[in-house]
């Protein structure tokens, strides 16, 4: 559903930010 898509997108965004901060 839409919530799953939103959660997946949010998780991806958080991972991207975390990776950016770690570097």
Curated annotation (Swiss-Prot):
It is found in: Secreted; Target cell membrane. GO terms for biological process: defense response to bacterium; innate immune response. The modification Asparagine amide is found at residue 23. Keywords: Amidation, Amphibian defense peptide, Antibiotic, Antimicrobial, Immunity, Innate immunity, Membrane, Secreted, Target cell membrane, Target membrane. One of its GO terms (cellular component) is extracellular region. Transmembrane segments: none annotated. Expressed by the skin glands. Belongs to the frog skin active peptide (FSAP) family. Alyteserin-1 subfamily. Antibacterial peptide with amphipathic alpha-helical structure. Shows selective growth inhibitory activity against the Gram-negative bacteria E.coli (MIC=25 uM). Has a weak hemolytic activity against human erythrocytes (LC(50)=200 uM). Is not active against S.aureus (MIC=200 uM). This is Alyteserin-1b. It comes from Alytes obstetricans (Common midwife toad).
């Amino acid at each position: 559903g839409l919530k799953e898509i939103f959660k997946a997108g949010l998780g991806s965004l958080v991972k991207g930010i975390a990776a950016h901060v770690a570097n």
